[in-house]
Amino acid sequence: MTNPKLDLLQPYPFEKLRAELAKTQYVGDLAPIALSIGEPKHPPPQFVIDALCDTDAMAQHLATYPATRGSDALRQAVADWLHKRFAVNASAEHNILPVNGTREALFAFAQAVLSGQPRSLVGMPNPFYQIYEGAALLAGATPYFLANTANTGYQADFEGVSERIWDATELLYICSPGNPTGHLVSDAQLQRLIELAHRHDFIIAADECYSEIYFSEERRPNSLLAASDAMGNKDFARCVVFHSLSKRSNLPGLRSGFVAGDAPIIEKFLHYR
């Protein structure tokens, strides 16, 4: 006996690609360039390796169960980084929750916040990170795909969504910078989405794992939390962001990240975990 909703899930694309690539034969001495999974190709920071090799510290931490909230020091470090990077004042105690990488967090978040009503919708960009779709389906909701095509400038046309659809929406996943388009959701668009979230009673889950990959200091990607703060929504109501060390710090194997935003929602997510 298994959950029948599992039959709704599509095969994980990266596992399928891995199997197909394993059959490929390469000609010549040049190593192939992998364009399948967004895996960093640079070494991890040395100070992280040094910390992991500190046997005394590791012996102390590995011998005890960690707190689900994470340590006070870790949450404060996240709060300090959010202030330095995005100029927002997030409470280490109430607005931040460390997670084991954002893949599982993005999935689990939907299970924690969706009502389970069969007609509820979860908005998401298309193309998209497959976790968004799976999270919606396993939570009993219906994915609503927002096409990112050449006709829309490779971005979601939020203004083209009807009031009826917004009314049925319980959760909206956005990804900025977007994968695979690289599109940035502007501050004006983020604030418009926050207005819609308040009007139609849904939550925005912003996947910001690519926020530190950019070419110019003048065009650094912004955060949903910063847009929220700038419009006076200083408690980040209905806004939650997901950050990971995988891409920005070349540490996908560490499975380390955090979720930050609306304090009551973070508390509910902590209760779920």
Language model features by range: what are they?
Residues 41-45, 180-183, 200, 212-213, ...:
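Short catalytic/ligand-binding loop motif for oxyanion handling, primarily in non-cytosolic enzymes
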Residues 208:
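Walker B catalytic acidic pair
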Residues 204-205:
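Residue-level marker for buried hydrophobic side chains located in beta-strands
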Residues 226-273:
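Conserved core segment of the aminotransferase class I/II
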Residues 2-104, 108:
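N-terminal small-domain helix-loop-helix segment of the aminotransferase-like
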Residues 28, 139, 199-200:
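Helix C-cap/helix->beta junction micro-motif
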Residues 61-195, 212-213, 217-233, 240:
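Conserved core of the PLP fold type I
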